[in-house]
Design a protein with these regions (language model features):
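Short, Lys/Arg-rich, polar N-terminal cytosolic tail immediately upstream
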Residues: 1-10
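Terminal, non-globular segments
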Residues: 10-207, 221-513
């Protein structure tokens, strides 16, 4: 396959455009590199970097990743440092290199098919702006390195198959090196090697030259050297991985089940959405034009140019990770990043699809505009939202500003959060006792509860960080105990991390009600527990309502309790709805005649004007929403008043329970969100 040199003028223009695109890629990947919080897995990375190379390997043997990435990152951070910027800069650099490798792959396609001249720059632009690649270029994990070595592997494979000048040393070194690094980086890399091997066999066996040699009745002739060179390179890759192979097999056989099998159409929609927008939790409005283009352009490229064998490697490379996702049922947030290895092939197929349309010079400007618009809609959220990743940094700053360490306790459920929390306690100089539970897997209920009870004794405020509890604490042992014995206040999702505050009052006074109100036919409120009458609560803090229930007969239905704070116009200022005892003791399980201890904390919203507010409660059917009535025909009972005062310390905007953050200046005021 011969190479055709572009005119010198075009070459100079192409070089300048490539330089500008790489500059753009670097700017987007290094911009606000430490602007978002480290999350749990990045905390694990940070913890491993303080250990020796041998200890890293030993710890990785018990984890679900080989040690190669950690070894390389440890060398990198000897110069760059182990703070968030230093660790993430390794991935950012890998992200820029990936964009360059995509360009080189595009140039190889252009050399094979001169009609595709321009595809390399178009694919490079798409990769430079791609939110999926940018997001993982700003994470101290191995997934961008995995995408880079996958792309380098296929670039080397193309060179091995198309070199017109004999053996390409760069291709040989690139294939062997990327194969070795890939296997030592992630256990999913064998699917990429398999795709490369299948690509080689398909192209090699379909070669007209091979068919010609076969027709002569002899062996594969001169092309045998290509075949055995490829076999030798793969043997070298496997040989370099042999020391870790037994560990890898053991870890893969015990791979944790955390994915989800979904229908094909839904899986492809999620795949395309991820390739376009990355880990964005909500796609932009009117996303369908991008999704349609992401699906149709690669299909059009393959259908229009199927006879051109140079596109076959892209097709197999693109499909390999998707087949892995469907085959193992990995469609969940935790595994969508495996699609990064398909992202370079997808970018190239998208560009080829544009160039395969009638009059491509008419279509590429809208394609470029659409790519820029997609990045403009998506990237600001990645750069500015505090919940782009699990916001441990924001929580640490909040505790540093507001918590009283002598009276507080941080509870980590699950223990996998310990390393990232230690990072922020070190760099933010946060001194506060911390308890990680459950300490066994599977959890030991007796030991877990005993440890928790001892730790929370004499602690007025508990700060619970719930993360990945489906695996670490599937029975919700920690949360159920806290719901039963403390008063839940602020509850805020910070990425995939749920931050909850609990209050343990020391001055709670329980008063029997002289005329216990009856809800419906059987439920009575026998006592009310509060710190004082009336309570005094600062805006942003929690009003405490302790309810004591009894039922005179078995209850066939499940009812929810609603506690509401009303202003003078009966507007609801704050509200908490829950099944009794934090959902752990539904009404249809209440023992007849026994007292049910049911504690509720109601967060008074930040910004609530000072003044007196009424507290009411009601019980309602959780299916129909119909409230139980009292003998006076009211469907609520007034508990008393709460006095709201101004807070001494404002709640950080990142922790406010808002659906949308705006931060719009309105003269001397700021509209934070709604």
């Amino acid at each position: 396959m011969s190479e055709r040199q572009a005119p010198a003028k075009w070459q100079r223009l192409e070089q300048w455009l490539l330089f500008l695109l790489l500059l753009l890629a670097a700017g987007l990947r290094f911009y606000r590199l430490d602007g978002s919080s480290l999350w749990s897995d990045e905390g694990n990375t940070w913890a491993l970097l303080s250990r020796s190379f041998a200890q890293i390997a030993q710890d990785a043997a018990a984890d679900i990743h080989p040690p190669g990435y950690y070894w390389l990152l440890k060398l990198w951070t000897l110069v760059a440092g182990t703070n968030a910027w230093g660790m993430r800069s390794f991935s950012a650099l890998a992200g820029v290199l990936l964009v360059y490798v995509i360009f080189r792959l595009g140039r190889l396609l252009e050399d094979e098919q001169p009609s595709l001249r321009g595809v390399a720059l178009l694919a490079t632009l798409l990769a430079a702006l791609n939110p999926f690649q940018i997001y993982y270029s700003q994470e101290a994990r191995m997934y961008l390195l995995l995408a880079l070595v996958s792309a380098t592997l296929f670039w080397s494979l193309y060179r091995l198959l198309t070199s017109a000048t004999g053996v390409s040393v760069g291709a040989v070194v690139g294939y062997a090196g990327s194969g070795i690094v890939g296997l030592w980086t992630h256990y999913s890399f064998p699917i990429v090697l398999a795709a490369a091997g299948l690509t080689f066999l398909v192209l090699y066996l379909s070669s007209s030259r091979i068919r010609k040699h076969k027709a002569r009745g002899g062996p594969l002739g001169a092309n045998q050297a290509i075949f055995w060179r490829f076999v030798g390179l793969n043997a070298l890759i496997i040989l370099a991985y042999l020391p870790w192979l037994p560990t890898a097999i053991a870890r893969i056989l015990h791979w944790p089940q955390g994915g989800e099998s979904i229908p094909f159409v839904e899986g492809m929609q999620l795949t395309l959405r991820t390739l376009l927008f990355g880990s964005l939790r909500e796609a932009p409005d009117l996303a369908w034009p991008w999704l349609l283009g992401a699906a149709l352009l690669p299909l059009w490229a393959l259908a229009r140019r199927w006879q051109e064998r140079s596109l076959w490697p892209l097709a197999l490379w693109f499909l390999a990770p998707i087949v892995l996702m469907f085959g193992l049922g990995l469609f969940s947030d935790a595994f969508l990043k495996f699609l990064l290895t398909a992202s370079p092939a997808w970018a190239l197929l998208m560009a080829v699809g544009v160039w395969s349309l009638p009059k491509p010079r008419v279509w590429w400007p809208p394609f470029v505009a659409g790519s820029i618009a997609l990045a403009a809609f998506t990237l600001p959220t990645y750069y500015t939202s505090p919940t782009t990743r699990d916001n441990y940094a924001g929580i640490a700053r909040y505790l540093q500003a507001t918590a009283q360490p002598a009276q507080a306790l941080v509870i980590l459920d699950a223990p996998g959060q310990q390393e990232v929390w230690q990072y922020y306690t070190k760099y933010d100089q946060l001194t506060m006792p911390t308890l990680a539970l459950p300490q066994q897997r599977p959890p030991d209920p007796t030991a877990t509860i005993a440890t928790l009870e001892a730790a929370v004794d004499n602690r007025a405020t508990l700060y619970a960080l719930f993360w990945a509890t489906d695996e670490a604490d599937p029975e919700r042992l920690v949360e159920r105990w806290l719901d039963q014995h403390a008063f839940k206040g602020l509850e805020s999702w910070q990425g995939n991390l749920r931050f909850v505050t609990y209050v343990q009052p020391t001055d709670l006074a329980c008063n029997e009600l002289s005329s216990p109100p009856r809800f419906g036919k059987a439920i009575r409120l026998t006592a009310l527990c509060q710190p004082a009458t009336p309570q005094t609560v600062a805006a942003g803090e929690v009003a405490l309502v302790g309810l004591r229930w009894q039922t005179e007969a078995g209850l066939p239905q499940r009812y929810k309790v609603t506690v509401q704070v009303l202003d003078s116009r009966n507007n609801v200022i704050a509200q908490r709805d829950s099944e009794p005892v934090g959902g752990s003791l539904p009404t249809d399980q209440w023992p007849v005649g026994a007292t049910v201890v049911d504690n509720h904390g109601v967060l008074i919203p930040p910004g609530t004007p000072p003044g007196a507010y009424r507290i009411i409660i009601a019980l309602y059917d959780q299916n129909s929403g119909e409230r139980l009535r009292l003998p006076d025909d009211h469907d609520y009972f007034v508990l008393g008043e709460v006095e709201v005062v101004r807070p001494q310390q404002s709640l950080p905007a990142a922790l406010l329970p808002l659906q949308q953050l705006i931060h719009q200046k309105l003269g001397p005021l700021e509209l934070v969100g709604y």
